[in-house]
């Protein structure tokens, strides 16, 4: 009963969080409707082969051949035996709430746990949770289907809570919280978000260090640091399978360093990603005002005509054009919405800079500034270049605008510290009232100025790209159209300026009423909570709203099979590939749903495959389209051996070509080399450049090009004859079986993508795989009849799983110790109480 009484308010807060989360998604959650997310819909084909194989065999394959000729599944909803336990524990943490509802719930709960670790009272912690959880970006990523990112962001605050507890001297609680939530965090599988939050932790640890130096408590600081490190290591160990294989995979992807030596390296980073690619989505410098004013740049990249209020100012003559023009006019190529942290929250943050004391304030300010500067990306390249070149791992991630998640954490936290300071020391509103006015002026004042004089501060309401596009219109339309467009967008901007202004005015009124003792602390907190919740709720409903939810059957219905799909699927060959020339080949996974595609979409495709796309596959696609069209689809009139040899070596058996009216037609490729073949010769080269260049200098059906480092595995082949045959007799995505007949032996090339971890056996005896033609597997066999098996069951999986289960044992032991210590402490407390 005492325990229940102690935590009753916390339990009530958790219930309120669950109610808020349910209400946001009403009536969709009551109707059983689900969110139709483009990113999730696009991933159907990506994981379809993996899912089918699991349904049929009960086994999880770590390889699929459905996209990009073949790639690991480590970053396709990764699942390991060790993480299944974590999945069940996280469901309990979510209170088994339904999808979408629990996303918001864990946002709220996570920040609440952290603020309680900072020793905030329940009501203040609840308010802080609301203003953090309802930051617009967190709802935008739900709408976009970036669910791993949602999970990662939700688990970070409670992980930081463990760090805070450790540095406050509560070592065991800090250790357990750090271990559990770092395990949750790593399991969420969004390394980019975790990496960004490490900057926050670094700044906070520095603040704790400064405090320890001032108090002469370095020993205590060292102990707390050790506790945090041990907790993190336990959390990491539970996810070692996922972490290790993600790291290993990363070395082979576009995020790993290329072996090619490029002539123009100025745009390259050490990670292998181009600077332009990394910074493509960079926040505009003046776009940073969205933190205070959500529609400072128009909001999301949706048709302007969808904004009914703004269209009241539209010239009827241009309504059709406004269907094509976006509401957003910022620097990014496009956006699903702005980063808005709350207008009154911004004012409290500024106030916190004035009245909060101690190193933690400076740590949060430094992290905020860093986040904003890095979010500018290509708009502030000297600073960005420094991080790309010298800060470990920073160049591994693109979409630099998303680093604003740091500011979305630090701004609400310092804002809540300011409010806590006011409640703990009410006299501060009297003694430092000028600082309140200054904070009001620096936020509401700017909103007012922008609303009254938008063109003075923001002269550009039309992007450079839009200006160029509009110049294609007749000259007599350009002036009136651009003038009307500016007027519409000004109205969007000024409307939100006034909105933020009044939110800050109302919030400031709560502070003044508290100063005048017309409101108690709890009533002030409740009023601010309602104000901020309504403010941010309304903004979020612009980007995640009920009409986006559809009947569950829409998502679960299998992808519709086209006539082209049906024709190709009549081919009962075990394994062949399809090239869809009627789609955006390397930006879609629909083809992969029913076929093994040459194309696909994945943000981390294998680097060598991408390099082959750039050097050979993309040029061959253009030549193929032209040649097949000129031949009227008659492949006997197409010189396939010379026009598309790389596609042939990838066993591209079918091309899908576009027809008028959106229809498609399949064309069979008679030149495809098949699943495997003997070559007459292996031509060895000295480096990756010579290897990729050599591919189009030989007849790939008879000659293989290999890096000299594979000479020991492959040796040399011999001239073949018609009796040399390689036939696939069994296909599984992670296990391929071939029947080989050859009187001469030699090197067999497989039309399968080379990747570390694949093993080969000949008649049950292991042989070493080599890599040829830049991306394919090969082995050398002796004369005779053989059974060759290629298998992908990496030994590293067993090793990392063993470590993970040891980690579970350590964590369970710590939990038992923690419970024992708590029971002992309570007994001691009760004994003292009874004596008194």
Question: Which positions does each model-derived feature cover?
Answer:
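Extracytoplasmic/lumenal acceptor-recognition loop(s) of multi-pass membrane glycoenzymes
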Residues: 54, 59, 65-72, 79, ...
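Hydrophobic alpha-helical transmembrane segments
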Residues: 97-111, 337-352, 407-416, 499-507
